[in-house]
Curated annotation (Swiss-Prot):
Keyword Cell membrane: yes
Main location: membrane
Cysteine pairings via disulfide bonds: 153-221, 154-186, 170-180, 187-200
GO biological processes: positive regulation of Notch signaling pathway; protein localization to plasma membrane; protein maturation
Residue positions with a glycan: 169
Name this polypeptide is given: Tetraspanin-14
Stretches of the chain found on the membrane's Extracellular side: 39-61, 114-232
Origin organism lineage: Eukaryota, Metazoa, Chordata, Craniata, Vertebrata
Membrane protein topology class: Multi-pass membrane protein
Highest taxon listed in the record's lineage: Eukaryota
Amino acid sequence: MHYYRYSNAKVSCWYKYLLFSYNIIFWLAGVVFLGVGLWAWSEKGVLSDLTKVTRMHGIDPVVLVLMVGVVMFTLGFAGCVGALRENICLLNFFCGTIVLIFFLELAVAVLAFLFQDWVRDRFREFFESNIKSYRDDIDLQNLIDSLQKANQCCGAYGPEDWDLNVYFNCSGASYSREKCGVPFSCCVPDPAQKVVNTQCGYDVRIQLKSKWDESIFTKGCIQALESWLPRNIYIVAGVFIAISLLQIFGIFLARTLISDIEAVKAGHHF
């Protein structure tokens, strides 16, 4: 039996530092997401009383920001250290996680296309759940307001969905000043007004439905998003393809570097 030493095998500095630079962006983005999330929780007093996390209603957008931050920070750290230290274990972790995320994204996209009714029902439940908690969380409130203003919509299927919120409910048991109203983000903007009128939605739903469209958006946000997607399908597809290509590029760099390291290690065993 003869053993040969591959004396020409070496780790490419080009791939090594390109992968390091690639992951620095991941790591820094993770730091930013974590910083923003922790700052937002600090502003709401969650950090000083962690039991508030379990008492939150609806979906707290900050949780999503923190989750993305943790994943990006962890991947960036593993990729940076793995590339600099030529650590196959960390590089395999980075590569494997990116591959997993890539296929999860692909699966979600395919399932969302095949089961559109199910997705629509889940989004309705999500929106209605957060309508109920509209006044409980400032971040959630800003998210819904931004969604309604950007899409010129109101509620999940229409303004009447705001009956789900205790403050906007039209029942006789409610003594809220916002009773039978909608949030200001449902209001049709007046170009003549330079200052946002946050009370423009008060008592709107007391009027006849035929007059609602004079002052508020009557289209539901689910319908608005369903109309928005076909009009912007090329933008959505472009973003998805760009993210996928970045992930594939990262996988390629990691696998190439792993192969170089393994070749060098194999060359030392003779």
